[in-house]
Curated annotation (Swiss-Prot), chain A:
CoA carboxyltransferase N-terminal domain sequence ranges: 2-257
Protein name: Malonyl-S-ACP:biotin-protein carboxyltransferase MADC
One Pfam short name: Carboxyl_trans
One Gene Ontology cellular component annotation held by this UniProt entry: cytoplasm
Superkingdom of this protein's organism: Bacteria
Function: Gamma subunit of the biotin-dependent malonate decarboxylase multienzyme complex (EC 7.2.4.4). The two subunits MADC and MADD are required for the transfer of the malonate carboxy group from the acyl-carrier protein (ACP) to the prosthetic group of the biotin carrier MADF. Required for the regeneration of ACP.
Disulfide bonds: none
The enzyme's E.C. designation: 2.1.3.10
Keywords: Cytoplasm, Transferase
MF terms in GO: acetyl-CoA carboxylase activity; carboxy-lyase activity; transferase activity
Gene encoding the protein: madC
Lineage, top ranks: Bacteria, Pseudomonadati, Thermodesulfobacteriota, Desulfuromonadia, Desulfuromonadales
Keyword Plastid (UniProt): no
Organism from which the protein derives: Malonomonas rubra
Stored InterPro entries: AcCoA_carboxyl_beta (IPR034733), ClpP/crotonase-like_dom_sf (IPR029045), COA_CT_N (IPR011762), Malonate_beta (IPR017556)
SUPFAM superfamilies, per the entry: ClpP/crotonase
From Swiss-Prot, chain B:
A Pfam family: ACP
Identification of the protein by name: Malonate decarboxylase acyl carrier protein
Annotated positions of the O-(phosphoribosyl dephospho-coenzyme A)serine modification: 32
Stated family: Belongs to the MdcC family.
Record's keyword terms, sorted: Cytoplasm, Phosphoprotein
Organism per entry: Malonomonas rubra
Keyword Cytoplasm: yes
Any one of the GO CC terms: cytoplasm
Localisation: Cytoplasm
Organism ancestry: Bacteria, Pseudomonadati, Thermodesulfobacteriota, Desulfuromonadia, Desulfuromonadales
Curated annotation (Swiss-Prot), chain C:
Pfam families attached to this UniProt entry: Mal_decarbox_Al
Keyword Chaperone: no
Organism (species): Malonomonas rubra
SUPFAM superfamilies hit by this protein: NagB/RpiA/CoA transferase-like
Domain of life per record: Bacteria
Keywords recorded for this protein, A-Z: Cytoplasm, Transferase
NCBIfam families referenced in this protein's UniProt entry, alphabetically: mdcA
Catalytic reaction list: acetyl-[ACP] + malonate = malonyl-[ACP] + acetate
Name of the molecule in the record: Acetyl-S-ACP:malonate ACP transferase
Amino acid sequence: MAKWTELQDKSFLEATARERAVGIVDEGTFTEFCGPFDKIYSPHLPLMGEAIEYDDGLVAGVGKIGKKPIFVISQEGRFIGGSIGEVSGAKMVKTIQLASDLYEEMVSEKPDLPEEMRPAVVISFETGGVRLHEANAGLLAHAEVMDQIQNCRGRVPIISLIGSRVGCFGGMGFVAAATDVIIMSQFGRLGLTGPEVIEQEMGKDEFDASDRALVYRTTGGKHKYIIGDCNYLAADSIRSFRETTTAVLQKPMEEIETFRRIGSMEKIKEQIELVKLSVSLKPKDSMDVWAHAGNENPESLINMTLDEFLAQAKRLKA
Amino acid sequence: MEGMLNELNFKFKSENPVDVVLPKHHYGVVGSGDLEVLLKKHELEGAVEIRVVSPVRGFDHVWEKVLEKVISDAEVGNVAIEINDNNATPVVVALRLAQALSEAKSAEQSVN
Amino acid sequence: MQKEKVWDKLSTDTEERMNAANELFSDRKVVPSQNGVALLEAVIRAGDRINLEGNNQKQADFLAECLGSCDSEKINNLHMVQSAVPLPIHLDIFDKGIAKKLDFAYGGPMAAKVAEFLREGKLELGAIHTYLELFARYFMDLTPRVSLICAYEGDKDGNLYTGFNTEDTPVIAEATKFRQGIVIAQVNKLVDKVQRVDIPGEWVDAVIESPKPFYLEPLFTRDPANITDTQVLMGMMALKGIYGEYGVQRLNHGIGFFTAAIELLLPTYGNELGLKGKICKHFALNPHPTMIPAIEDGWVESIHSFGGELGMQKYCEARPDIFFIGPDGSMRSNRAYSQTAGHYATDMFIGGTLQIDKYGNSSTATASRVAGFGGAPNMGCDAKGRRHVTDSWLKCGAEFEDQAALLGDMPRGKRLVVQMQETFKEKMDPSFVEKLDAWNLAKNANLDLAPVMIYSDDLTHIVTEEGIAYLAKCRGLEERMAAIRGVAGYTEVGLSADPKETKTLRERGIVKTPEDLGIDRSRANRSMLAAKSVKDLVDCSGGLYEPPARFVNW
């Protein structure tokens, strides 16, 4: 693997899970949990004659940004689409739990522990959700992750990073939506039902999954930024994701809570307003929504560079 | 390895083997057509042991030739290697293993 | 009593046919689209030779649908002469018995269906051609009686604007009309005045505005994100060991990721080797999006194109010093002329293939797919009629050892014909084989010959990840085979190499490994590419390149 300094300029889109995990925290601070040499791999895949990976497609560990302990979870889309099975799911659950336990321990020892030393969780998503080869275990892991995320509410901030090839879909789309802050790049995609599944269920007229431009302007980073599903758009480099993450984590927990999409009566009301808007607007395409948000020539935003886009794009207000 | 996966074991010795520097090293991702390599420094009287786990069958002789060539070119010894493969072609196998060995041989410690 | 000889049967017949269609016209040469089927039923006779325009890019798909909807009781046993059969409707026409015989050049996605229909007797094959070869026969023994073509714009007088995607249209229209045939055009738009007259109205008998724009396949777009490290390595080898070595300035690139990698290495590795201005100045080439960085970096002087490429129109129009742009400001492609340029005026053809046999013959056919040839063989061969001289042509000719066996001491040049292929494709499918699958196809589909894309006697170089085989330098077939074995890696062909023999060939410079070429393998990775994604290409073009939806990932 490239050195940490070289990793910073690496495309986040092309980076492996381990590169993202190592590069997102400060140089030389990353320690991996259950790494390849621990050989904790899926017991199900060999039975089906499927290739295994010793980290089960998920890199977990802990590092630091400044004085802050950062618990990192990073999914590898190249291994079975980044799908979550029994082992990768358990690694995810346990890592969040460790962050929560550490928080408890540190704060009980020192109740006035400065914000800058309190632990946080960063999840780099690249997944279509449940691994179908081990579906029950995978589904259970999703529920347990949700449980851990709830447990961290108001105590340990959880940041989602989405900018890898596979995007973040299926059950993991729900998981990402339940975290505090979502950072995407314009190459990131976030959704629940994947494009191919929508096409399969509803037909090509409803959603043409081979029309990648349609897929991206419906699930991609720019759209999610305009409609508020994602909080920040980063450039496509590990450095940009790290810097954005660092900036977010400098904010106090109360402020980070305000970035959430769900989780309070107020947030639910905002979401209901959005549902009302979608009923009255009847958008045929995301461009209708962009226009409604105040973007006069929405198509022109699609091919803009990130800086131009951030300077010009108007975001939806519920 | 239980189940349906093919497990292969090889032992090679190159002419002037040099020890790797890193005590252990991991390289690669088990993507489609790709593989991961795990290297562990291990006293083997200069030899190299390789264990391959792969869903592919019927190419055991090709594995042997490719691995033998890479080890002989790399001139390394005293290292135990594990490979988890998912349909990698010989060119990818040779490329990844050579890259992994080259990193493990270099004194420059990489990030993990 | 001697009967007076009739010399204008064709034009009389054409007049009769057109008269039968009279009432279907709404205005001068305009026929409403709902009359499409009736028009074809009026002017086509059973057993006619019909051209249906369509190649590996644009398709007269509306007229194809109309033909497929004709009554097979009235219209049947047609002899189709057409560049390509890539759409399902092309085969439906045979399934319904409307057509019987086929002469074509390129099978594309329907290649398996063509083989199946041949076996089942639903389709009788004339021959598989190259594009230029088929065009030649339009002016010899395969002139169409009726041609169904397509254009962007048409007017009431039949003038057509085919613009960026002119492609095969002029050849078809000229061959048909000048033997008194009937030319029917589907157009995307009926206009008062066409942007530019690409086909004069006199050559066109009927114009139909199609309900949908004609289908266009972005066949030449390669997403840089899918280029592998191995392809980068082989691209570096080709640039240093062939482009640089021979100073290749006039060339064609085949379709594929190997040549896409080379295009994206020009502004990086090419500059590092100091090759700008020395190689890659003139191309017969479709407007490959992956050429944008090299064009922007000042490598290229001219590109003439066989066809347009979806999304590249604005970019090409904004670079009139490079592309062939009309007085109206839009590009005109022309397959016949570009293929001619590719055959006579290039010094190198380089492209990928599927299989290479132990002698060096290569083919993209598999046992169950009649893939056809397209244009590659016209460029992937030595143009025997060529007489003009360039340095790289002379250099390769001087190296060509076996030439003396037929020419004595008479010097002659030779085109570089280069095949690039990894020794194994996905799933351990070897690229080097004892016998090509094309032999099995010939048996399965009752072909007279195994379809060979490039014959060994034309091939001068093979590039694999193992090395470059300089075949032109070899003495005799045995030595060529040894050189091929020397770069065939761990395939059965490669494993049969004698290491001593390969070593001798390396010493003689007939086989060169990346190390022999002085290429550091550890540098061969995607970071060498001037663009790593389609978005990079868009940014590099200053927003002029508008990629098709399927290539957009932002």
